[in-house]
Amino acid sequence: MLKSLYWRLNFFFKNRKSKRLKKRLGNNSSTLTVNTKNGTFVIDPADLEVSRKLAVKGEYGTEEIIQISKFIDNKSTVLIVGAHIGSLAIPIAKLCSELVAIEANPNNFKLLETNIKLNNISNILAHNIAASEKEEIIQFQLNTVNSGGSKRVPINNHYMYTYDNPEVIEINAYSLDDYLPKSNFDLVLIDIEGSEYFAMRGMTQILTKTNTLIVEFLPHHITNVAGVELTDFLNNIPKHLTKLTIPSKATTYPIDVGVTILEQMFESGHGDDGIIFHN
């Protein structure tokens, strides 16, 4: 009970802080431009996660970018599902040949397009759609305090997903096998706040041809957003990938051992921003 109260208070104060920042800037300053290690970015100051880290720390996801760079080169093709405003996509695009970016949130997508142009990136092809198991229209909530946390309306819509009273809209979702037919990607990164399960079900052909798959792994997303079991989630991982790296543990495992570790993490509620399946 005390833990639940702590998180409710934490979310409450985050929401209040976000609103105060927005109010302080006034109606004529809905965005800010910041120069960072990742590039130059137009950000939403109300976003206290990725945007705030870019503004305050001058960087975001540095370790993740370094990790990804080990699996690609200047001839590689990359697919990022959940590109947000481009804080990872833009620096990664400088390391590869071609990058396809999928972003469902229309507000984030506008910033993504702006940031691609601002950084003179010519090898990113961006799409404002959601990834799912089939072509459909889904209910999608636009979070503001953590705009990267925007997601399809969860099956179990816990307070942690709604504390900032997100607007709910309808957006178009597609199977990426159908939307990006005959596409080959050396590396696929999926970070879409619990919809990874649905996205992977709709991109089996893409996944069978990739060399590296990076997927956000948060037990509460798998349970509450997708409403599935861990085994359902893992059944989507392509069988040809034989190793699993868990960055938060700084360890690479054979796939069978790694799956056992993931089961333990799932039971204890521990996640990782991007577990890596590879060879």
Give residue spans per PLM region.
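S-adenosyl-L-methionine
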Residues: 1-115, 119, 161-169, 179-181, ...
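Short, glycine/acidic-enriched loop or turn micro-motifs at the edges of active sites
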Residues: 47, 83-85, 106, 131-133, ...
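Short internal loop-to-helix segment that lines adenine-nucleotide cofactor pockets
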Residues: 56-79, 121, 125, 137-139, ...
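Core-facing hydrophobic residues within beta-strands of well-ordered domains
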Residues: 96, 185, 207-210, 241
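Active-site flanking residues adjacent to catalytic metal/cofactor-binding acidic residues
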Residues: 102, 190, 215-216
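Core alpha/beta nucleotide-donor-binding catalytic domains of modification enzymes
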Residues: 113-114, 118-149
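Conserved beta-strand signature within the Rossmann-like core of class I S-adenosyl-L-methionine
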Residues: 210-218
